Protein backbone atom coordinates (compact mmCIF):
# COMPACT_ATOMS: atom_id res chain seq x y z
CA UNK A 1 0.00 0.00 0.00
CA UNK A 2 1.48 3.30 -1.06
CA UNK A 3 1.36 6.16 1.35
CA UNK A 4 1.67 9.88 0.75
CA UNK A 5 2.61 12.22 3.56
CA UNK A 6 1.16 15.62 4.32
CA UNK A 7 0.72 17.63 7.48
CA UNK A 8 -0.41 21.01 8.64
CA UNK A 9 1.88 23.99 7.95
CA UNK A 10 4.60 21.77 6.43
CA UNK A 11 6.45 22.46 3.22
CA UNK A 12 8.44 19.34 2.47
CA UNK A 13 12.04 20.49 2.37
CA UNK A 14 14.52 17.64 2.01
CA UNK A 15 18.07 17.44 3.34
CA UNK A 16 20.22 20.49 2.83
CA UNK A 17 23.73 19.53 4.03
CA UNK A 18 24.39 16.88 1.49
CA UNK A 19 26.60 15.26 -1.09
CA UNK A 20 24.76 17.38 -3.66
CA UNK A 21 22.80 20.39 -2.48
CA UNK A 22 19.19 20.36 -3.59
CA UNK A 23 16.11 21.83 -1.95
CA UNK A 24 12.79 20.55 -3.22
CA UNK A 25 9.46 22.26 -2.59
CA UNK A 26 6.27 20.25 -2.91
CA UNK A 27 2.79 21.80 -2.74
CA UNK A 28 0.37 20.39 -0.24
CA UNK A 29 -3.12 20.91 1.09
CA UNK A 30 -3.94 21.21 4.79
CA UNK A 31 -5.25 17.97 6.25
CA UNK A 32 -8.44 18.17 8.24
CA UNK A 33 -8.90 16.21 11.45
CA UNK A 34 -10.54 12.82 11.24
CA UNK A 35 -12.66 10.92 13.70
CA UNK A 36 -10.56 8.73 15.96
CA UNK A 37 -11.51 5.05 16.00
CA UNK A 38 -10.27 1.99 17.89
CA UNK A 39 -7.91 1.48 14.92
CA UNK A 40 -5.81 4.35 16.24
CA UNK A 41 -4.37 5.34 19.57
CA UNK A 42 -6.35 8.42 20.62
CA UNK A 43 -4.76 11.67 21.68
CA UNK A 44 -5.90 11.04 25.25
CA UNK A 45 -4.29 7.59 25.28
CA UNK A 46 -1.15 9.04 23.72
CA UNK A 47 -0.81 11.43 26.67
CA UNK A 48 -1.27 8.51 29.08
CA UNK A 49 1.53 6.64 27.29
CA UNK A 50 3.85 9.64 27.76
CA UNK A 51 3.02 9.80 31.46
CA UNK A 52 3.66 6.07 31.86
CA UNK A 53 6.95 6.38 30.00
CA UNK A 54 8.11 9.15 32.33
CA UNK A 55 6.99 7.19 35.38
CA UNK A 56 9.09 4.19 34.33
CA UNK A 57 12.10 6.31 33.35
CA UNK A 58 14.30 6.19 36.43
CA UNK A 59 16.67 8.89 35.19
CA UNK A 60 13.97 11.39 34.25
CA UNK A 61 13.95 14.70 36.13
CA UNK A 62 10.41 15.42 34.94
CA UNK A 63 8.02 16.31 37.75
CA UNK A 64 4.66 14.56 37.87
CA UNK A 65 2.73 17.83 37.57
CA UNK A 66 4.10 18.57 34.09
CA UNK A 67 1.25 18.90 31.61
CA UNK A 68 1.51 17.55 28.05
CA UNK A 69 -0.73 18.61 25.18
CA UNK A 70 -0.94 17.53 21.53
CA UNK A 71 -3.13 20.23 19.94
CA UNK A 72 -2.73 20.10 16.14
CA UNK A 73 0.66 18.39 16.07
CA UNK A 74 -0.57 15.30 14.23
CA UNK A 75 1.29 13.72 11.30
CA UNK A 76 -1.00 12.12 8.74
CA UNK A 77 -0.46 9.69 5.89
CA UNK A 78 -2.70 9.18 2.89
CA UNK A 79 -4.18 5.71 2.47
CA UNK A 80 -4.51 5.39 -1.30
CA UNK A 81 -6.93 2.48 -0.95
CA UNK A 82 -9.49 4.24 1.25
CA UNK A 83 -8.43 7.76 0.19
CA UNK A 84 -8.45 8.79 3.84
CA UNK A 85 -5.90 10.76 5.82
CA UNK A 86 -4.98 8.61 8.80
CA UNK A 87 -2.93 9.68 11.84
CA UNK A 88 0.56 8.21 11.98
CA UNK A 89 1.96 9.86 15.10
CA UNK A 90 1.39 12.69 17.56
CA UNK A 91 3.76 15.22 19.09
CA UNK A 92 2.97 15.87 22.76
CA UNK A 93 4.60 19.03 24.10
CA UNK A 94 5.18 19.86 27.75
CA UNK A 95 4.27 23.22 29.25
CA UNK A 96 6.78 26.07 29.12
CA UNK A 97 9.07 24.37 26.62
CA UNK A 98 10.00 21.61 29.05
CA UNK A 99 10.20 18.77 26.56
CA UNK A 100 8.18 16.71 24.13
CA UNK A 101 7.42 13.15 23.09
CA UNK A 102 6.60 11.66 19.70
CA UNK A 103 3.88 9.04 20.15
CA UNK A 104 2.81 6.45 17.58
CA UNK A 105 -0.88 6.57 16.69
CA UNK A 106 -0.83 2.85 15.95
CA UNK A 107 -1.86 0.75 18.97
CA UNK A 108 0.19 -2.14 17.57
CA UNK A 109 3.56 -0.37 17.74
CA UNK A 110 5.84 0.97 20.44
CA UNK A 111 4.06 4.05 21.80
CA UNK A 112 7.04 6.34 22.46
CA UNK A 113 9.15 6.98 19.37
CA UNK A 114 11.17 9.86 20.81
CA UNK A 115 11.45 11.75 24.08
CA UNK A 116 13.24 14.90 25.19
CA UNK A 117 13.20 16.87 28.43
CA UNK A 118 14.07 20.18 26.77
CA UNK A 119 12.28 22.36 24.24
CA UNK A 120 9.12 21.77 22.25
CA UNK A 121 8.71 20.30 18.78
CA UNK A 122 6.26 21.47 16.11
CA UNK A 123 5.55 20.13 12.65
CA UNK A 124 6.24 23.63 11.34
CA UNK A 125 9.82 23.38 12.68
CA UNK A 126 10.63 21.70 9.36
CA UNK A 127 10.68 25.18 7.85
CA UNK A 128 13.82 25.98 9.86
CA UNK A 129 15.25 22.50 10.33
CA UNK A 130 14.57 20.95 6.94
CA UNK A 131 16.00 17.56 7.90
CA UNK A 132 13.01 16.97 10.20
CA UNK A 133 10.93 16.16 7.11
CA UNK A 134 13.19 13.18 6.49
CA UNK A 135 12.98 12.13 10.12
CA UNK A 136 9.18 12.30 10.22
CA UNK A 137 9.08 10.19 7.07
CA UNK A 138 11.33 7.62 8.73
CA UNK A 139 8.97 7.35 11.68
CA UNK A 140 6.02 6.62 9.41
CA UNK A 141 7.94 3.88 7.60
CA UNK A 142 9.06 2.38 10.89
CA UNK A 143 5.50 2.30 12.23
CA UNK A 144 4.29 0.53 9.09
CA UNK A 145 7.05 -2.08 9.23
CA UNK A 146 6.76 -2.62 12.98
CA UNK A 147 3.05 -3.31 12.60
CA UNK A 148 3.92 -6.07 10.17
CA UNK A 149 6.70 -7.63 12.27
CA UNK A 150 4.74 -7.51 15.51
CA UNK A 151 1.78 -9.28 13.96
CA UNK A 152 4.02 -12.01 12.55
CA UNK A 153 5.88 -12.47 15.81
CA UNK A 154 2.85 -12.55 18.05
CA UNK A 155 1.39 -15.30 15.89
CA UNK A 156 4.65 -17.24 15.94
CA UNK A 157 5.41 -16.61 19.63
CA UNK A 158 7.86 -18.74 21.58
CA UNK A 159 5.88 -21.94 21.99
CA UNK A 160 5.98 -24.94 19.68
CA UNK A 161 2.18 -24.94 19.76
CA UNK A 162 1.84 -21.40 18.46
CA UNK A 163 2.01 -22.07 14.68
CA UNK A 164 -1.16 -24.15 15.11
CA UNK A 165 -2.96 -21.06 16.44
CA UNK A 166 -2.20 -18.92 13.39
CA UNK A 167 -5.75 -19.14 12.03
CA UNK A 168 -7.23 -18.63 15.51
CA UNK A 169 -5.35 -15.43 16.44
CA UNK A 170 -8.60 -13.49 17.24
CA UNK A 171 -9.20 -16.00 20.05
CA UNK A 172 -6.07 -14.82 21.90
CA UNK A 173 -5.22 -11.64 23.76
CA UNK A 174 -1.90 -10.25 24.96
CA UNK A 175 -1.24 -8.79 28.40
CA UNK A 176 2.07 -6.92 28.56
CA UNK A 177 3.82 -6.44 31.88
CA UNK A 178 5.55 -3.20 32.95
CA UNK A 179 8.67 -2.02 31.20
CA UNK A 180 11.94 -2.33 33.12
CA UNK A 181 15.09 -0.42 32.26
CA UNK A 182 18.02 -2.81 31.93
CA UNK A 183 20.90 -0.52 30.95
CA UNK A 184 21.72 3.16 30.42
CA UNK A 185 24.70 5.25 29.36
CA UNK A 186 24.23 8.99 29.83
CA UNK A 187 25.12 11.29 26.90
CA UNK A 188 28.89 11.52 26.46
CA UNK A 189 28.99 14.89 24.69
CA UNK A 190 28.36 18.03 26.74
CA UNK A 191 28.34 20.65 23.96
CA UNK A 192 25.32 21.68 21.90
CA UNK A 193 26.90 23.26 18.87
CA UNK A 194 25.31 24.39 15.60
CA UNK A 195 26.10 25.75 12.14
CA UNK A 196 25.64 29.50 12.47
CA UNK A 197 27.38 32.17 14.54
CA UNK A 198 29.62 31.84 16.47
CA UNK A 199 30.58 28.51 14.91
CA UNK A 200 30.86 29.90 11.38
CA UNK A 201 32.81 33.03 12.35
CA UNK A 202 35.86 31.73 10.45
CA UNK A 203 33.92 30.30 7.50
CA UNK A 204 34.42 31.82 4.03
CA UNK A 205 32.58 35.01 3.17
CA UNK A 206 30.10 34.68 0.31
CA UNK A 207 28.46 37.88 -0.91
CA UNK A 208 29.37 39.50 2.39
CA UNK A 209 27.87 36.71 4.51
CA UNK A 210 29.52 33.86 6.39
CA UNK A 211 28.85 30.42 4.99
CA UNK A 212 27.25 27.85 7.27
CA UNK A 213 29.63 25.36 8.84
CA UNK A 214 27.77 22.36 7.41
CA UNK A 215 26.42 19.40 9.37
CA UNK A 216 29.52 17.30 8.60
CA UNK A 217 31.77 19.82 10.36
CA UNK A 218 29.36 20.26 13.28
CA UNK A 219 29.04 16.52 13.94
CA UNK A 220 32.80 15.98 13.62
CA UNK A 221 33.61 18.91 15.92
CA UNK A 222 31.21 17.68 18.59
CA UNK A 223 32.80 14.21 18.59
CA UNK A 224 36.24 15.81 18.92
CA UNK A 225 34.98 17.89 21.84
CA UNK A 226 34.34 14.68 23.77
CA UNK A 227 37.82 13.26 23.14
CA UNK A 228 39.39 16.75 23.55
CA UNK A 229 41.82 16.08 20.73
CA UNK A 230 43.78 17.39 18.91
CA UNK A 231 45.55 19.91 21.10
CA UNK A 232 45.80 22.19 18.11
CA UNK A 233 45.85 22.30 14.34
CA UNK A 234 47.10 24.57 11.58
CA UNK A 235 48.71 26.98 14.03
CA UNK A 236 45.66 27.26 16.30
CA UNK A 237 45.78 25.93 19.88
CA UNK A 238 42.66 24.19 21.15
CA UNK A 239 41.97 24.84 24.81
CA UNK A 240 39.13 22.35 25.06
CA UNK A 241 38.03 23.30 28.55
CA UNK A 242 37.57 26.90 27.44
CA UNK A 243 36.06 25.96 24.07
CA UNK A 244 33.43 23.70 25.64
CA UNK A 245 32.52 26.37 28.16
CA UNK A 246 32.59 29.31 25.75
CA UNK A 247 31.51 28.63 22.15
CA UNK A 248 32.39 32.25 21.31
CA UNK A 249 36.06 31.35 21.70
CA UNK A 250 37.82 32.05 18.36
CA UNK A 251 39.36 28.58 18.56
CA UNK A 252 35.90 27.02 18.16
CA UNK A 253 35.30 28.81 14.87
CA UNK A 254 38.80 27.86 13.68
CA UNK A 255 38.10 24.21 14.58
CA UNK A 256 35.00 24.25 12.39
CA UNK A 257 36.90 25.92 9.54
CA UNK A 258 39.77 23.43 9.76
CA UNK A 259 37.36 20.51 9.68
CA UNK A 260 35.46 22.07 6.79
CA UNK A 261 38.62 22.44 4.74
CA UNK A 262 39.73 18.87 5.46
CA UNK A 263 36.39 17.34 4.41
CA UNK A 264 36.42 19.50 1.25
CA UNK A 265 33.34 21.44 2.23
CA UNK A 266 31.19 22.94 -0.51
CA UNK A 267 30.55 26.21 1.31
CA UNK A 268 27.22 27.98 0.98
CA UNK A 269 25.12 30.64 2.72
CA UNK A 270 21.98 28.51 2.86
CA UNK A 271 23.70 25.14 3.16
CA UNK A 272 27.24 23.75 3.20
CA UNK A 273 27.79 20.14 2.21
CA UNK A 274 30.56 17.55 2.14
CA UNK A 275 30.82 13.89 1.27
CA UNK A 276 30.60 11.52 4.22
CA UNK A 277 33.48 9.45 2.85
CA UNK A 278 35.84 12.36 3.64
CA UNK A 279 35.15 12.21 7.40
CA UNK A 280 37.56 9.35 8.32
CA UNK A 281 40.50 11.06 6.62
CA UNK A 282 39.71 14.29 8.48
CA UNK A 283 39.97 12.49 11.81
CA UNK A 284 43.24 10.88 10.75
CA UNK A 285 44.81 14.18 9.69
CA UNK A 286 43.80 15.69 13.03
CA UNK A 287 45.59 13.02 15.06
CA UNK A 288 43.08 10.20 15.42
CA UNK A 289 43.39 6.61 14.35
CA UNK A 290 41.62 6.59 11.00
CA UNK A 291 38.06 5.31 11.49
CA UNK A 292 36.61 2.82 9.06
CA UNK A 293 34.62 3.99 6.09
CA UNK A 294 30.92 4.68 6.65
CA UNK A 295 29.11 1.37 7.14
CA UNK A 296 25.48 0.28 7.04
CA UNK A 297 23.47 1.36 10.07
CA UNK A 298 23.29 -1.16 12.89
CA UNK A 299 21.91 -0.18 16.27
CA UNK A 300 24.08 -2.89 17.83
CA UNK A 301 27.29 -1.32 16.44
CA UNK A 302 26.11 2.08 17.65
CA UNK A 303 25.46 0.76 21.16
CA UNK A 304 28.74 -1.19 21.30
CA UNK A 305 30.66 1.92 20.26
CA UNK A 306 28.91 4.05 22.88
CA UNK A 307 29.72 1.43 25.52
CA UNK A 308 33.37 1.83 24.48
CA UNK A 309 33.03 5.59 25.15
CA UNK A 310 33.13 6.43 21.46
CA UNK A 311 30.33 8.69 20.16
CA UNK A 312 29.05 7.64 16.74
CA UNK A 313 28.57 9.74 13.62
CA UNK A 314 25.37 8.89 11.73
CA UNK A 315 24.66 9.91 8.13
CA UNK A 316 21.44 9.70 6.15
CA UNK A 317 19.89 10.80 2.86
CA UNK A 318 16.33 11.72 1.97
CA UNK A 319 16.40 11.08 -1.78
CA UNK A 320 17.26 7.85 -3.58
CA UNK A 321 17.49 7.83 -7.37
CA UNK A 322 18.49 5.33 -10.00
CA UNK A 323 19.98 5.82 -13.45
CA UNK A 324 20.45 2.75 -15.65
CA UNK A 325 20.13 0.59 -12.55
CA UNK A 326 22.80 2.51 -10.62
CA UNK A 327 21.58 3.87 -7.28
CA UNK A 328 22.70 7.17 -5.87
CA UNK A 329 21.55 9.32 -2.97
CA UNK A 330 21.02 13.04 -2.49
CA UNK A 331 20.15 15.53 0.24
CA UNK A 332 21.86 14.35 3.40
CA UNK A 333 22.34 15.13 7.05
CA UNK A 334 24.99 14.08 9.57
CA UNK A 335 24.44 13.89 13.33
CA UNK A 336 25.80 12.17 16.44
CA UNK A 337 24.66 9.44 18.84
CA UNK A 338 26.39 9.56 22.21
CA UNK A 339 24.20 7.71 24.72
CA UNK A 340 21.43 5.15 25.01
CA UNK A 341 19.18 3.14 27.27
CA UNK A 342 17.49 -0.23 26.93
CA UNK A 343 14.25 -1.46 28.43
CA UNK A 344 12.31 -4.69 28.14
CA UNK A 345 9.04 -6.27 29.17
CA UNK A 346 7.41 -9.68 29.04
CA UNK A 347 4.20 -10.08 27.10
CA UNK A 348 1.91 -12.95 28.09
CA UNK A 349 -0.58 -14.27 25.56
CA UNK A 350 -3.83 -15.81 26.85
CA UNK A 351 -6.63 -17.66 25.19
CA UNK A 352 -9.66 -15.41 25.55
CA UNK A 353 -11.73 -16.40 28.57
CA UNK A 354 -8.81 -18.23 30.19
CA UNK A 355 -6.41 -17.12 32.95
CA UNK A 356 -3.75 -19.58 31.83
CA UNK A 357 -0.77 -18.23 29.87
CA UNK A 358 -0.66 -19.86 26.45
CA UNK A 359 2.79 -18.51 25.58
CA UNK A 360 5.02 -15.51 26.32
CA UNK A 361 7.60 -13.43 24.52
CA UNK A 362 9.95 -10.59 25.42
CA UNK A 363 9.92 -7.15 23.84
CA UNK A 364 13.12 -5.12 23.96
CA UNK A 365 13.56 -1.49 23.01
CA UNK A 366 16.73 0.54 22.57
CA UNK A 367 16.65 4.33 22.60
CA UNK A 368 19.65 6.26 21.26
CA UNK A 369 20.52 9.72 22.51
CA UNK A 370 20.94 11.94 19.46
CA UNK A 371 22.64 15.29 19.10
CA UNK A 372 21.38 16.73 15.82
CA UNK A 373 23.85 19.61 15.61
CA UNK A 374 21.12 22.27 15.82
CA UNK A 375 22.30 24.17 18.92
CA UNK A 376 20.64 21.57 21.13
CA UNK A 377 17.27 21.68 19.35
CA UNK A 378 15.57 18.26 19.33
CA UNK A 379 18.38 16.54 21.23
CA UNK A 380 16.87 13.58 23.05
CA UNK A 381 16.25 9.85 23.00
CA UNK A 382 14.98 8.24 19.80
CA UNK A 383 13.90 4.68 19.15
CA UNK A 384 16.90 2.98 17.54
CA UNK A 385 14.86 0.97 15.05
CA UNK A 386 13.50 3.95 13.14
CA UNK A 387 16.81 4.38 11.31
CA UNK A 388 16.46 1.08 9.51
CA UNK A 389 13.11 0.99 7.77
CA UNK A 390 13.52 -2.67 6.86
CA UNK A 391 14.10 -3.91 10.40
CA UNK A 392 11.33 -4.80 12.78
CA UNK A 393 11.45 -4.41 16.54
CA UNK A 394 13.95 -6.36 18.61
CA UNK A 395 12.28 -9.73 19.01
CA UNK A 396 14.10 -13.04 19.64
CA UNK A 397 12.95 -14.33 16.26
CA UNK A 398 14.82 -14.86 13.03
CA UNK A 399 11.82 -13.46 11.22
CA UNK A 400 12.36 -10.04 12.81
CA UNK A 401 16.15 -10.11 12.89
CA UNK A 402 16.73 -10.02 9.15
CA UNK A 403 18.49 -7.00 7.71
CA UNK A 404 16.24 -4.77 5.66
CA UNK A 405 16.92 -2.60 2.66
CA UNK A 406 16.97 0.88 4.14
CA UNK A 407 15.85 3.32 1.47
CA UNK A 408 17.66 6.35 2.86
CA UNK A 409 21.22 5.07 2.96
CA UNK A 410 21.69 5.51 6.71
CA UNK A 411 25.31 4.78 7.59
CA UNK A 412 27.45 5.10 10.70
CA UNK A 413 31.06 5.78 11.61
CA UNK A 414 31.56 4.07 15.00
CA UNK A 415 34.60 3.45 17.21
CA UNK A 416 36.20 6.86 16.69
CA UNK A 417 39.09 7.21 19.14
CA UNK A 418 42.40 9.01 19.46
CA UNK A 419 44.84 6.09 19.37
CA UNK A 420 47.17 6.29 16.39
CA UNK A 421 48.14 3.07 14.64
Task: Give the label of every model feature segment.
Residues 29-42, 46, 54, 77-174, ...:
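Noncatalytic regulatory segments and standalone regulatory/sensor domains
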Residues 52-57, 106, 218-230, 285-286:
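Structured segments of extracytoplasmic/periplasmic soluble domains
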Residues 78-97, 293-366, 371:
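Active-site-adjacent substructure of cysteine-protease-like catalytic cores
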Residues 213-217, 221-225, 251-341:
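Predominantly the structural core of cysteine protease catalytic domains
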Residues 20, 115-121, 125-272:
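Active-site-adjacent structural segments surrounding the nucleophilic cysteine of cysteine proteases
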Residues 11-37:
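Bacterial Sec-dependent N-terminal signal peptides
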Residues 1-15:
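Sec-dependent bacterial lipoprotein signal peptides
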Residues 61-66, 229-240, 290-297:
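Surface-exposed patches in mature extracellular/periplasmic domains of secreted proteins
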Amino acid sequence: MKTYYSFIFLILFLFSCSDEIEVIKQPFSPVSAINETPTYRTKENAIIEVENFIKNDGSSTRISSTNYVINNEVYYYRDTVTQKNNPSFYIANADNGNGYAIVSASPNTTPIIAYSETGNLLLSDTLRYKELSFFFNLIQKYISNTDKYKTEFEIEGTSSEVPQTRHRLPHYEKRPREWKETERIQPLISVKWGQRSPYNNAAPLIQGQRALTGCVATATAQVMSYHEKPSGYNGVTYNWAEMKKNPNSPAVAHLFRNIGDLVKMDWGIDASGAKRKNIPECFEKMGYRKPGNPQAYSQWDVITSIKAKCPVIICGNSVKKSIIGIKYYKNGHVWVSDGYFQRERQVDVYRKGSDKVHHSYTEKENYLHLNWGWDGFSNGYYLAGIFNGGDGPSFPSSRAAGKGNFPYNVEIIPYINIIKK
